[in-house]
A protein has these predicted regions:
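Membrane-helix interfacial "entry" motifs
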Residues: 7-11
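Structured cytosolic domains appended to multi-pass membrane proteins
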Residues: 56-174, 179-188
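Conserved small/polar residues in nucleotide/adenosyl-binding loops
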Residues: 1-5
Length: 189
């Protein structure tokens, strides 16, 4: 059996920094998800029920719509809240979303972006993507500050976010129970 030693100090330091960054991100994620760190590291999510809890389908009243109907709602709205998520990052659609926001602002619509701390691949991912698309920082509003604004929003447009908007988090016994969510279901549309 060979005995190996790492004699490269730079490699050891780099490894320690990567490990420390990983622990820091894990702590931030566990805090934002309202979970103990060990639960996050072990992959534990709730009590083992299905993601929807007892109900197998969506809750509430569902209304079929079309792109044309959504466009009309957006243009005639006074206030629109965009809710970006991991799907936005995967589609690399942050510039298109920012362009839509600019178009609506040009029609006098108040536009803001609801930022969940764990949306995307890591904490702060949505902030970085939207800043890259030149969305003004003042329009990026975090979870605690944006949730009271949803009832006054004419439209909440969810773009690639699901777990951070899942109302099952409000029910005990679901895998996402207790995780803070964006209250998109409280908007007018």
């Amino acid at each position: 059996m060979y005995k190996r030693q790492i004699n490269n100090i730079a490699l050891i330091v780099a490894g320690a920094l990567v490990g420390a960054a990983g622990v820091t991100l894990s702590l931030a994620m566990s805090k934002a998800m309202n979970r103990p760190l060990m639960s996050v590291l072990a992959g534990g999510f709730g009590g083992g029920a299905s993601a929807g809890g007892e109900a197998d389908g969506p809750e509430g009243t569902m209304k079929e719509t079309s792109a044309d109907d959504v466009a009309v709602q957006l243009v005639y709205a006074d206030k629109v809240i965009f809710v970006p998520g991991f799907g936005l990052a995967q589609a690399q659609a942050q510039r298109e979303l920012a362009d839509l926001g600019d178009l609506l602002k040009g029609h006098g619509v108040e536009v803001s972006y609801a930022i969940h701390p764990v949306a995307g691949r890591m904490p702060g991912h949505m902030n970085v993507l939207l800043a890259e698309a030149n969305v003004p920082y003042e329009e990026l509003i975090d979870l605690d500050d944006i949730n009271p604004q949803f009832p006054s929003a004419n439209v909440a447009l969810v773009v690639g976010a699901n777990d951070v908007t899942n109302p099952a988090a409000r029910r005990p016994g679901t895998p996402v129970s207790g995780m803070p969510i964006l209250d998109v279901d409280k908007s007018q549309n």
